[in-house]
Amino acid sequence: MKKLFILAGPTAVGKTDISIEVAKKIDGEIISADSMQIYKYMNIGSAKITKGEMQEIPHYLIDIIDPKENFNVSRYKNLAEKTIEDIYSRNKFPMLVGGTGLYINSLICNYDFTDAKVDVNYRNYLENLAKVQGREYVHSLLKDIDAVSYERLYPNDLKRVVRALEVHKLTGKTIGEFNSKDSLYDIPYKIYYFVLNMDRVKLYERINKRVDLMIEQGLIDEVKNLRSMGYTKDMQSMKGIGYKELIRYLEGDISLDEAVYLIKKGSRNYAKRQLTWFRKDERVIWVNKDEFTSNKEIVNYIINTLVTC
């Protein structure tokens, strides 16, 4: 089975430096799993890695999408899978690095982003059947094909009843089998999934300092430039943290101090949500940075863990 290394963690925890050092040791090439770094021109606000910071380690899925485009997880999965195969073809170790949990899960969970698991016509048929013969009748259809759902779901819970029937028609599986962890983790990779974390107070301090640094580096001018290029607040890309707040400032809706406050608050809340997301996956190997004295120690721990896995 092909190997896939993952290094994730909340914003500002310090994934970049560690990923570079790991890549040097395992002959790795890095695929970004960041929903903002994928956009062109949005460099400061996304904390996009620079050429110098890459230290000649190849990086992919950075700076490739125009900000006017709507980009989704299905497109990401498609691009990332092709990139992984390309890296394998050169006998290198693919490394997925970033903090966008949904992007990561698109590759390490058995998600289906096609319409193959949806049958709109059958769904409409069942909903019409419920109107004609009653919800109890539609619910009774579960009895012989999915006894567990039949007992668990009430007839009035039509949406879930219909979904259970639809899944069985399309897959031959009960909804429980379809959603099982065995099915969810049925992927073509052997994964090594590390998530960095640190004391929350320290993390929030790092986030606040990073936002201040972004302002010093010219984030306001970056947003002004994006607007002059025709990118508007209604676009998906411009709704990212740091961009939407500064647009409000430039439009005169809030002061700069208020904008910076909101960016810091939004970033801290995002970090909290990221950690909640990563905790849901039992495959994660947690790396608490507070338990190490240096990044070198962390890298050595990761490498030693890779060897023993």
From Swiss-Prot:
The record marks T100, R123 as: Interaction with substrate tRNA. Residues 34-37 are annotated as: Interaction with substrate tRNA. Its EC number is 2.5.1.75. Gene3D superfamilies: 1.10.20.140, P-loop containing nucleotide triphosphate hydrolases. It is an enzyme of class 2 (transferase). It comes from the Bacteria. ATP binds at G9, P10, T11, A12, V13, G14, K15, T16. Its cofactor is Mg(2+). GO terms for biological process: tRNA modification. Substrate binds at T11, A12, V13, G14, K15, T16. It catalyses: adenosine(37) in tRNA + dimethylallyl diphosphate = N(6)-dimethylallyladenosine(37) in tRNA + diphosphate. Keywords: ATP-binding, Magnesium, Nucleotide-binding, Transferase, tRNA processing. One of its GO terms (molecular function) is ATP binding. Catalyzes the transfer of a dimethylallyl group onto the adenine at position 37 in tRNAs that read codons beginning with uridine, leading to the formation of N6-(dimethylallyl)adenosine (i(6)A). NCBIfam families: miaA. Monomer. Belongs to the IPP transferase family. This is tRNA dimethylallyltransferase. The lineage of its organism: Bacteria, Bacillati, Bacillota, Clostridia, Eubacteriales. The gene is miaA.
